Amino acid sequence: MLIGVISDTHIPDRASEIPEAVFDAFRDVELILHAGDLTSPDILTELETLAPVECVQGNMDRHYGIETPRSRLFEIESFRVGLIHGEVYPRGDTQQLRYLGLELGADVLISGHTHQPFIRELEDMVLLNPGSPTVPRLTDPSVMVLRIDGEKLDAEIIRTGAPVCRSLNFRR
């Protein structure tokens, strides 16, 4: 199964639209998982033109009255895939995310919130974060594509926009 993973779209509060590169990256997916901070349910309608969408509530979604579950668990082939927004502090703390995944009974946990993509393989769980395609934090805009085939899982971070500035030399 091919799955598109996205988070932290923040449309329309911080960005005006989903980049076309997201639609290109998700062209052949069978399912889209959104890890929260939609800030408008309209994003779901747009993504549903590609594939069915499942989502969870992000911290900003509560401010906009978007009522979706705070966590979900999906049985996809031989994997139990958890979906959360991932509001842990410090942001992206793998130990806290692991505990949340264990509470869900997940062997794969997808989260967002950091606006920074990562793939972490722990002893008993894989932690995935697609980053943000619209408002990345000190990294390139991105989404993720998962391929689950029986007992095999492949995850790929896909850049969806221009790279951010990595260095600057400034002189007066």
Curated annotation (Swiss-Prot):
<dbReference type="Pfam" id="PF12850">
    <property type="entry name" value="Metallophos_2"/>
</dbReference>
<dbReference type="InterPro" id="IPR041802">
    <property type="entry name" value="MPP_YfcE"/>
</dbReference>
<feature type="binding site">
    <location>
        <position position="8"/>
    </location>
    <ligand>
        <name>a divalent metal cation 1</name>
    </ligand>
</feature>
<feature type="binding site">
    <location>
        <position position="113"/>
    </location>
    <ligand>
        <name>a divalent metal cation 2</name>
    </ligand>
</feature>
<dbReference type="InterPro" id="IPR020935">
    <property type="entry name" value="PdiEstase_YfcE_CS"/>
</dbReference>
<comment type="similarity">
    <text>Belongs to the metallophosphoesterase superfamily. YfcE family.</text>
</comment>
<dbReference type="GO" id="GO:0016787">
    <property type="term" value="F:hydrolase activity"/>
</dbReference>
<dbReference type="InterPro" id="IPR000979">
    <property type="entry name" value="Phosphodiesterase_MJ0936/Vps29"/>
</dbReference>
<feature type="binding site">
    <location>
        <position position="37"/>
    </location>
    <ligand>
        <name>a divalent metal cation 2</name>
    </ligand>
</feature>
<dbReference type="InterPro" id="IPR029052">
    <property type="entry name" value="Metallo-depent_PP-like"/>
</dbReference>
<feature type="binding site">
    <location>
        <position position="37"/>
    </location>
    <ligand>
        <name>a divalent metal cation 1</name>
    </ligand>
</feature>
<dbReference type="GO" id="GO:0046872">
    <property type="term" value="F:metal ion binding"/>
</dbReference>
<feature type="binding site">
    <location>
        <position position="115"/>
    </location>
    <ligand>
        <name>a divalent metal cation 1</name>
    </ligand>
</feature>
<protein>
    <recommendedName>
        <fullName>Probable metallophosphoesterase MTH_1774</fullName>
        <ecNumber>3.1.4.-</ecNumber>
    </recommendedName>
</protein>
<keyword id="KW-0378">Hydrolase</keyword>
<feature type="binding site">
    <location>
        <position position="59"/>
    </location>
    <ligand>
        <name>a divalent metal cation 2</name>
    </ligand>
</feature>
<keyword id="KW-0479">Metal-binding</keyword>
<dbReference type="InterPro" id="IPR024654">
    <property type="entry name" value="Calcineurin-like_PHP_lpxH"/>
</dbReference>
<feature type="binding site">
    <location>
        <position position="10"/>
    </location>
    <ligand>
        <name>a divalent metal cation 1</name>
    </ligand>
</feature>
<feature type="binding site">
    <location>
        <position position="85"/>
    </location>
    <ligand>
        <name>a divalent metal cation 2</name>
    </ligand>
</feature>
